[in-house]
Amino acid sequence: MPEKKFDFSPAVKPFNVIQPTEKEFDLFRELILKELGLIWGKEKIYLLHARVHRRLQYHQLQTFQNYYDFLQSEKNRSELQFLYNAVTTTKSGFYREKQHFEFLRSEIFPKMKEQMIRKRKKMRFWSAGCARGEEAFNMAMEAHDFLGTKLISEGGLRILASDVNTEVLDSAVKGNYTTEQISPVPEVLRKRYFVSDSDSDKNNDVLSIRSNIRKLIQFRHFNLMASEYPIATKFQLIFCRNVLYYLDPERREQLLNKLVNHLDDQGWLVLGITESGYRLNGMQKLSYCIYRKN
C-alpha cells in the first residue's frame, strides 16, 4: 500500500505553460521510455501538455525544458512519481474481457480446487498493472464464489495487486465503486460482495467491496520495469492484461520473461485478448491469450 498520497492540485495561481517543442517532447519521450518502457509516438505531443502542464504550474515552471531539468536533479527524484501518474494509462473495469473470467470458471478454478483439496495447496494470484483495483477484486470475487470460504480461509488464497501509479492505487485500496462501475458484475455477486459505503456522505451511488474480499488482496506500489521485483513467492495465476501493448519490443520481452519466471509450475498467465503473437518459452498457449507453464 502506498504510504504517500500525491496531490495534483496546483498550490499557486495557474499561469500559461508554453506548449512543448519537438525537442522538449523528444526529451520526455526518452525519459518515459527509460523509466516506464512506454512508447510515445510524435502524435502524443499534445498529450504531454494536457497531462503534465499542471505539474509545471505547481512548480512555477514555464517551459517543458525547465521541468525536464528539474526532474534531473537528484533532490527532485520524488517528482518522477507525479510524472508516472500523469502519463500512465489507467483504464480498468469489472469483467473487462469477460472471456477470461469464463475460462477461470470452466478450466482453471476446477483444477485449482482439486489441488487445494487433495494437496492442501495454497493459491497465489497476481494482478500486474491493477489500476483502480477492479481486476484484482474481480479475481477475488470469482475465486471466493467458486472455491468457497473454507478453501480460501486461513491463507488458502492471497492476491497481490500492483501498479506504478500511486493515484490509482490510493483509489483501489478504498475499494469504492459507483453503481455504474459495477454494472457488469452479475447481480448475485453484487449482492454477495458489495455493501453501501457508510463513508460516502450518504451517496447511495457508491458501493464498497466487502471486507472478506478486501482482506484477500495486498496492494503494492512498484514498477514492472524494475530490474528485480520485491516478490519472493511463485504465483499460480498472473493477470497482466493490456500492458504489453504500450511497451517497446525489448521491454515487452523482458517483462514477459519476468512474469514467466514468477509463475509456479503449471501456473497460468493471462494477457489481454489483443496481445497475441508472443512466443513464450516453456509456455503452452491455450485460448484468449491464456498460457500455461509446462
Regions found by a protein language model. Give the residues of each.
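Conserved AdoMet
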Residues: 2-126, 272
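Extended basic-aromatic, gly/pro-enriched interface segments that bind polyanionic ligands
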Residues: 128, 152-235, 239, 243-247, ...
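Conserved SAM-binding loop of SAM-dependent methyltransferases across substrates and taxa
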Residues: 132-151
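Conserved beta-strand signature within the Rossmann-like core of class I S-adenosyl-L-methionine
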Residues: 266-273
